[in-house]
Amino acid sequence: MIVLVTCLLLLCSYHTVLSTTNNECIQVNVTQLAGNENLIRDFLFSNFKEEGSVVVGGYYPTEVWYNCSRTARTTAFQYFNNIHAFYFVMEAMENSTGNARGKPLLFHVHGEPVSVIISAYRDDVQQRPLLKHGLVCITKNRHINYEQFTSNQWNSTCTGADRKIPFSVIPTDNGTKIYGLEWNDDFVTAYISGRSYHLNINTNWFNNVTLLYSRSSTATWEYSAAYAYQGVSNFTYYKLNNTNGLKTYELCEDYEHCTGYATNVFAPTSGGYIPDGFSFNNWFLLTNSSTFVSGRFVTNQPLLINCLWPVPSFGVAAQEFCFEGAQFSQCNGVSLNNTVDVIRFNLNFTADVQSGMGATVFSLNTTGGVILEISCYSDTVSESSSYSYGEIPFGITDGPRYCYVLYNGTALKYLGTLPPSVKEIAISKWGHFYINGYNFFSTFPIGCISFNLTTGVSGAFWTIAYTSYTEALVQVENTAIKNVTYCNSHINNIKCSQLTANLNNGFYPVASSEVGFVNKSVVLLPSFFTYTAVNITIDLGMKLSGYGQPIASTLSNITLPMQDNNTDVYCIRSNQFSVYVHSTCKSSLWDNIFNQDCTDVLEATAVIKTGTCPFSFDKLNNYLTFNKFCLSLSPVGANCKFDVAARTRTNEQVVRSLYVIYEEGDNIVGVPSDNSGLHDLSVLHLDSCTDYNIYGRTGVGIIRRTNSTLLSGLYYTSLSGDLLGFKNVSDGVIYSVTPCDVSAQAAVIDGAIVGAMTSINSELLGLTHWTTTPNFYYYSIYNYTSERTRGTAIDSNDVDCEPVITYSNIGVCKNGALVFINVTHSDGDVQPISTGNVTIPTNFTISVQVEYMQVYTTPVSIDCARYVCNGNPRCNKLLTQYVSACQTIEQALAMGARLENMEVDSMLFVSENALKLASVEAFNSTENLDPIYKEWPSIGGSWLGGLKDILPSHNSKRKYGSAIEDLLFDKVVTSGLGTVDEDYKRCTGGYDIADLVCAQYYNGIMVLPGVANADKMTMYTASLAGGITLGALGGGAVAIPFAVAVQARLNYVALQTDVLNKNQQILANAFNQAIGNITQAFGKVNDAIHQTSQGLATVAKALAKVQDVVNTQGQALSHLTVQLQNNFQAISSSISDIYNRLDELSADAQVDRLITGRLTALNAFVSQTLTRQAEVRASRQLAKDKVNECVRSQSQRFGFCGNGTHLFSLANAAPNGMIFFHTVLLPTAYETVTAWSGICASDGDRTFGLVVKDVQLTLFRNLDDKFYLTPRTMYQPRVATSSDFVQIEGCDVLFVNATVIDLPSIIPDYIDINQTVQDILENYRPNWTVPEFTLDIFNATYLNLTGEIDDLEFRSEKLHNTTVELAILIDNINNTLVNLEWLNRIETYVKWPWYVWLLIGLVVVFCIPLLLFCCFSTGCCGCIGCLGSCCHSICSRRQFENYEPIEKVHVH
């Protein structure tokens, strides 16, 4: 029956309802609804599933439930104040036919800076189908639009993927589950879907809640609603009991008792583990040395609970607790039958002294039946002290208490002062007595403990825990245990190795597992063995001191076997030996005569301690080898000594020394037993983890038989000194030695292991499904069972999921599936950004410069524990004392790799078309060309590979003469004068007789062709002969034709010589000009080859940088590996060898040196790696800038894209980065000008300035006092125009005088780097120095480009030498300039014949008188005319009037 109350006065006073009407909130009794009877019980037992009784406390839903809903379709708000938890029940009052489905309920728990929102739905809601109808959202937003949040704004409101927790709301939960949120200063607990989630949220809670609710359902009864809820402000306790499946609970009302019970009592879970959430009140970390104050570390502690006995109070009667045969009849919860190592008494006293007076508080029944009593006194006691007032007060003491160990009422040893407050006493079966975690006293092993006690206060509370040692991650605060994580599972082992109880999503190295007890394998050389048993007898002398304490006498005797009548020195003369110690104990009362047996407190045994030797005495029989080994009672010639001590029930006392003389070697072996004779004492345990000693090399590993054959060597080690294999000399079989544990990386998501990467194909971490990748095997919870994936390399398309964690290019999804994520595909063809013609100035040269930029580094994961300890369990325990050293190293590398992976993934993408052009064959194909280039046969043939096309073709056409003509005729080639020969041939018509008739004239000189055939020669010879013969008779004229012809031909030759001289001059001038051009051309070739040489040198430098980048990491890893050979001042670099030679305590000290040294080496490596990653991060950003500015566009910055004016750049992939080919213009000539920043002009009273508008132009003043503008990129001066300037107000230049302190106010981002570094060095100057390790060769793949770089440098040098040779050749060419010795031109004037001169004389005689007569006789001015005129004028003066007037006549 539902109780309906409509009055708002029933609402609790701790909350206030706003924006509601009086009928919208009612009080309901949820537990009375059908099916809700066990609502509270199920909620309380949701986190307590074990057998037993506990008291739990918290802000539980024990207050009034309310339901607020409205009939209107709009939503309303209600506010709760001063509460610490808020709970609600879904559809507690709705039947299955109601329509409240889809109606949201949302409440907001306010805090600063983080708050929490929980929203819930009945069915799938629009845009939230994947959230399973409910969501816990952690947000930093203070102001939330609740209306939008309920629909589609949740994704931007919740901060991060790990800040959203979806949960399920199903119809079967109809009112049967409580949902809610409880918060405090430490953590937040979310109760959803029958589970509780502990969220570590650091915030300041305001303890108020805003509730949003909507309209009610349309059920048949009134006021039915979809939700009931309550806010809780009171802390309550419940006592829960689970016995044989019967669960009962009751409200615990005795606050003091309930508080003590809840704080100190718990029910161990299955396996004896302390449950999560236990407060560990007054539980301390047990230690035999210094006490940890605070921290988190892995340790071996008695925290495995065999039985927990809650004891409200003790009676007066004594209680006895035994380690063996303990009866666990009163255990709370589960009980185990494990061996009890430590009994822990946890004391819950707060104020008064609780111990009863006069009681012997603790009695320890040690071996041999001797009972030691421990008691404390308020002052010092004497030998005859009465122990009637001795006590150990529990709780806070009222003064100092001095504690002693007593035997039969006599104080044997003073222990020390009791702590002011005793909270816990723990006693181990090995005789250790701890108070508040500190080892207060140690004695012989203990069988039982007894004491009597009266609590005295009703509120006192005890728990007695029978515990066993187990490995756990313990968090200590103020010396008290606060939290424990057991290293009992695969995921917990990783938590322990990472020193954290909460693992973030990521990859973690798998922790080494404990090897435990394994078989012993020994490999020795076959030999004939002789054996010696060395029996050492030690006779101890014991007596009591004046205070009754046992004292070992220095007169104790050591007896060695007699050898050569000498008992002071004994040397091993066989090749095998065993050492045995026999101890006797005699006592004396007062004198030094020891003739009585040692009993009771005088009982003592002799032990031989390590002393100064690099090996322990008890390890001598553990196959230690020597070349020489002697024991001596005298220090003379000794190398080291053992300390011989007497061990009593209270202490150890050194009485003598046993000296050792030894030499290292393999001739003598210490063995456990006699094996004399001819034997091969080798014992092998194959294919299983074994503790081995192979030819003196010790360790733990798996020995396997191999098929290898090696001719030399007995055993084979790595660079780090680890044993890799060995040879059995009897049969030559090679065996390999591998570690028992192989390093692996586990993928952890949401606190669970979902996968693991390993180098061997073997199941691990409980993972059975596997697949392979090119580099490792991957085991996962994902079911790789199909034929397509199991055992084969995976593909990124095999699994369709979103990776949660990534490492390099590997991603792991939440279901454990492995995907590769580093390839991002882009669509579209490869197209040029722009095209155009570039005009290169004559004072520039084109250069291609190569630049390499590193983009990423290969991620490195180091298993710190494996590197430092190599799986040695004792070393691993020592390593935990270094707290978070390994975790810091591994997380630094992992976080660096993840950050780099994210940046590289966001930077790089892959284009399919670009990949097609990556090969030469595809690049030289027209299939990938734009259509405008289709006419070319190939890209390479047209542009890049076309040298063959510009060479002469082998089938080019040439013209040749007729071979028949050359064979049948003699060819005479002469030089002719102009057209003389052609005109001569045309005139003669082939007749020799016409030779003189057809003589030609060249420049007025008669000439004949110089060649005469046989007929002409016969004709002229006959003429000459006839002339000679008939000369006397007057017939010499017959020789005239011959003379004329000869003279004409001589004229021809003379004129021909003149023409040849002119031609030679023309040829010489042309040749000299050609030689000048050749010299200039060779000079340009020389410059080109010089540029090519520089280009090759640049490429060589870039390749050297690539090689350095690739090899740097390998060299660093090599450096790290080599450090494993360094013993760091320990006796050996092998941890197994150290523990094999020394006792545990001495070995720990030696191994601690190795741990410190190796951690230092790891820190140096990590620092180097992180520094390198920081450099690469900057280089990656610079490469991105260069791609954007150089490749995708043209840079305007000089020197950014190559050292010059940038034209274009090409980028190509290179190992770990990119290589850029920058095409730039390099200036070859410079013009120096004086640049002006502006012009200051005056106009009367006004002064103004003019500055150049375009900052890429430079204003300068030339020698002619004129101003010019020129671009900065090339000298092209031009006259400035008014449009090139902009006017400014004035010409004043403002200078700011500021100090370094004032610079940040002027330049906000200014940082004084030098001062910052100096401050860091001063404030954080370390008091130690990191050793400088040398780099050695590491067994890794190196990028060896040395040969290629040397070849490039050789070619560059060869080209340089070629330029030198060309310079010499140019000088030689200049020396071949033609300087011809010109032929003298002789000009001969031919005299005219006599008859010519006769004719000239006759003409002069007859013509000159006639001309003179005409000149003097004619005209008005003639002589005759003048005489006639004179005569006439005398006769008559008017004669001239008879003449007609003269008129001017123009003749055209």
UniProtKB/Swiss-Prot annotation:
Region (Fusion peptide): 1025-1046
PROSITE patterns linked: COV_S2_HR1, COV_S2_HR2
Signal sequence residues: 1-32
Keyword Ribosomal protein: no
Region named S1: 33-779
S2: region residues: 780-1452
TM region positions: 1394-1413
Pfam families: CoV_S1, CoV_S1_C, CoV_S2, CoV_S2_C
Localization in the cell: Virion membrane; Host endoplasmic reticulum-Golgi intermediate compartment membrane
SUPFAM superfamilies associated with the record: Coronavirus S2 glycoprotein (SSF111474)
Chain segments carrying region Heptad repeat 1 (HR1): 1040-1159
Location of the region described as Interaction with host ANPEP in the Swiss-Prot/TrEMBL record: 660-804
GO terms for cellular component: host cell endoplasmic reticulum-Golgi intermediate compartment membrane; membrane; viral envelope; virion membrane
Coiled coil (UniProt feature): 1107-1151, 1341-1383
Keywords for this protein: Coiled coil, Glycoprotein, Host membrane, Host-virus interaction, Membrane, Signal, Transmembrane, Transmembrane helix, Viral attachment to host cell, Viral envelope protein, Virion, Virulence, Virus entry into host cell
CDD domains: TGEV-like_Spike_SD1-2_S1-S2_S2
Function: S1 region attaches the virion to the cell membrane by interacting with host ANPEP/aminopeptidase N, initiating the infection. Binding to the receptor probably induces conformational changes in the S glycoprotein unmasking the fusion peptide of S2 region and activating membranes fusion. S2 region belongs to the class I viral fusion protein. Under the current model, the protein has at least 3 conformational states: pre-fusion native state, pre-hairpin intermediate state, and post-fusion hairpin state.
Similarity remark: Belongs to the alphacoronaviruses spike protein family.
Entry text on domains: The KxHxx motif seems to function as an ER retrieval signal.
Protein name: Spike glycoprotein
